[in-house]
From Swiss-Prot:
GO MF annotation list: structural constituent of ribosome
Name this protein carries in UniProt: Large ribosomal subunit protein bL36
GO BP terms in the entry: translation
The keyword DNA-binding appears for this protein: no
PROSITE patterns assigned to the protein according to its UniProt record, in alphabetical order: RIBOSOMAL_L36
Key words of the record: Ribonucleoprotein, Ribosomal protein
Length: 37
């Protein structure tokens, strides 16, 4: 899980979702997991 000030989708499988007010990117590729904060 990368924590970044700005999150962007890396590939077409990345999905942007909101969890508890935070922007989270989930993907089938575990390296693409990101969280804003």
């Amino acid at each position: 899980m990368k924590v970044k000030p700005s999150v962007k989708t890396v590939c077409e499988k990345c999905k942007v979702i909101r969890r508890k007010g935070k922007v989270v990117i989930i993907c089938s590729n575990a390296k693409h997991k990101q969280r804003q904060g």
